[in-house]
């Protein structure tokens, strides 16, 4: 349950740019505290990383570190990142990449004390082109300064932010764990022997899969321009005698239709027609295009609008096709739709449920430099760039805040690791009126669970709401298949099998959609706090599951906000 904050060396090496491989100097690293100035030899770091020997100078800094911290620091110093110079260059020249560099450059400065923006970028690109590859030690060789100056004030502020977030997250999870115990004690006992078997078992339906390219030739932008959008979509159709409820799965940034194929197959076996669109502009193909120089941005700003419109368009097309296509005719119930989304897909699901973009909140939270703690703001703040080149920018932004993209066919949603805090805020999320699950992981460094999921849950006003928190969960645990990520992830499956979490998620998703789409009340016990709490006894990964948060905790959130 505890969030690990790396010690001094780990902080500098691994956290300064939230997962981006940093460059720390050529011959020495300098940092000051009050009137004192300290330095650390890069040669000493190299010897330690390659041979494990700690010099007397390095020992001054490492004597208070635990052995596991030292081992982690040594690994990060020598770990090679599989990124080509073209890929790293393309990302660092994108708007999001430059925002990250500016933020990192405030902390990692040149010898003269200037922002390290250009020096870091040059060093990373040159190191990626070196035969030795992009490692921290190799990057040091290319940093265009004899030394690097660490802005100690920024460093201590960063460490304080991390410590505060760690404390708040641990306190929140402890309260949620206690709340789950309280809720379980007030619920009627669940006789597990009388429940349907959902774990490690496919459902009774056979199914067929087809891929259809849906072409929207009339996609309108905020400015009124028209474009064509091709949405490759996998459809998993159960062989059922009655029309099947529909579940849409929306992938995250840089992922694709394969990311949750395991979930789609399982849901289809339980009688759901599963629709998995691939969002052009924020999928793996967009990421590959960026990294090979064929695109300039991680994703177009318009994806914030186009993603939910993709789902609505595909649902419209399926409804039309079901009237004439023998494969679909009489097979789907397009008025009973659920949406499951992860990360950017979680945002998509919440928009379809009725959440609205909160321009006022974004103006309060979005700064010129990225937040080094909450990297998800890089995505959320892109909403402020929508229409920025138009003379009617202010009016377009106002239109965006009033834009209602809810699809009323959507009756229930599950949002995994969604971005929420600034893009929606309380005003945007409180508009949702349908059943919602918000789920996250305590070890998520991309969308911090305290800000992006726990806080978001507290803002929901819908009666049917659920919060699930994995005590060791990361941002990527439930993603299967090959997913393109730009930056090396700090989330590692070290001592746990992600397959266990996916099996539990399959079972929960099936029960949730059976209850709210198929209206089969016998599945309600699976959604009880007591059932989930009982399941924790047999699993290495604990999931804390609640329907509400205690009033005193909510009051604390209001004070922080």
Language model segments and positions:
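Cap/lid segment of the alpha/beta-hydrolase catalytic domain
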Residues: 254, 258-261, 266, 275-309, ...
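Short beta-strand element of the alpha/beta-hydrolase
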Residues: 243-252
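Gly/Ala-rich beta-loop-alpha elbow adjacent to hydrolase catalytic centers
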Residues: 252, 341-349
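N-terminal cap/lid segment of alpha/beta-hydrolase-fold proteins
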Residues: 184-242
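Active-site-adjacent alpha-helix of alpha/beta-hydrolase-fold enzymes
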Residues: 430-502
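Alpha/beta-hydrolase active-site loop
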Residues: 296-334, 366-385, 395-399
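Mature extracellular/secreted ectodomains of secretory-pathway proteins
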Residues: 49-192
């Amino acid at each position: 349950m505890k969030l690990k904050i790396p010690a001094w060396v780990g902080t500098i090496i691994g956290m300064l740019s939230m997962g981006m491989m940093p460059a720390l100097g050529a011959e020495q690293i300098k940092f000051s505290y009050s009137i004192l100035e300290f330095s650390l030899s890069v040669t000493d770091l190299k010897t330690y990383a390659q041979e494990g020997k700690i010099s007397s100078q390095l020992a001054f800094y490492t004597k208070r570190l635990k052995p596991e911290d030292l081992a982690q620091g040594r690994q990060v110093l020598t770990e090679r990142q599989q990124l080509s110079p073209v890929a790293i260059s393309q990302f660092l020249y994108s708007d999001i990449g430059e925002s990250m560099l500016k933020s990192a450059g405030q902390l990692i400065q040149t010898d003269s004390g200037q922002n390290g923006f250009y020096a870091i970028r040059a060093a990373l690109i040159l190191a990626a082109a070196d035969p030795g590859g992009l490692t921290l030690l190799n990057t040091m060789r290319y940093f265009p300064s004899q030394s690097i100056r660490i802005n100690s004030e920024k460093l201590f502020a960063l460490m304080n932010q991390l410590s505060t977030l760690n404390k708040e997250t641990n306190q929140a999870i402890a309260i949620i764990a206690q709340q789950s115990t309280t809720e379980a004690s007030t619920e009627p006992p669940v006789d597990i022997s009388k429940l349907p078997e959902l774990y490690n078992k496919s459902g009774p339906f056979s199914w067929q899969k087809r891929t259809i390219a849906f072409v929207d030739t009339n996609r309108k932008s905020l400015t009124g321009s028209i474009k064509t959008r091709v949405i490759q979509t996998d459809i998993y159709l159960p062989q059922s005698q009655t029309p099947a409820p529909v579940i849409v799965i929306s992938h995250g940034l840089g992922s694709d239709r394969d990311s949750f194929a395991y979930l789609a197959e399982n849901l289809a076996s339980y009688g759901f027609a599963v629709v998995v669109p691939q969002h052009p502009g924020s999928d793996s193909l967009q990421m590959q295009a960026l990294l090979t120089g064929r695109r300039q941005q991680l994703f177009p700003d318009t994806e914030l609008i186009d993603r939910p419109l993709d789902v609505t368009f595909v649902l419209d097309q399926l409804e039309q096709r079901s009237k004439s296509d023998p494969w679909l005719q009489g097979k789907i119930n397009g008025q009973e739709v659920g949406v499951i989304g992860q990360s950017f897909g979680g945002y998509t699901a919440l928009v379809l449920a009725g959440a609205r973009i909160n321009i006022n909140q974004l103006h309060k939270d979005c700064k010129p430099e990225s937040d080094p703690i909450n990297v998800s703001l890089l995505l959320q703040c892109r909403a402020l760039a929508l229409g920025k080149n138009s003379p009617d920018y202010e009016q377009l932004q106002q239109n965006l805040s009033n834009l209602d993209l809810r699809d009323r066919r959507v009756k229930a949603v599950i949002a995994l690791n969604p971005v929420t805090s600034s893009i929606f805020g309380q005003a945007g999320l409180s508009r949702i009126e349908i059943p919602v699950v918000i789920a996250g992981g305590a070890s998520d460094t991309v969308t911090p669970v305290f800000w992006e999921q726990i806080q978001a849950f507290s803002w929901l006003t819908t009666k049917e709401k659920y919060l699930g928190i994995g005590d060791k969960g990361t941002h990527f645990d439930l993603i299967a298949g090959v997913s393109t990520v730009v930056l090396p992830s700090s989330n590692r499956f070290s001592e746990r099998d992600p397959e266990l979490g996916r099996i539990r998620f399959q079972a929960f998703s099936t029960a949730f959609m059976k209850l709210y789409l198929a209206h089969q009340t016998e599945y309600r016990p699976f959604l009880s706090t007591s059932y989930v709490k009982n399941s924790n006894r047999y699993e290495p990964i604990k999931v804390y599951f609640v329907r509400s948060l205690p009033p005193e905790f909510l009051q604390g959130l209001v004070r922080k906000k």
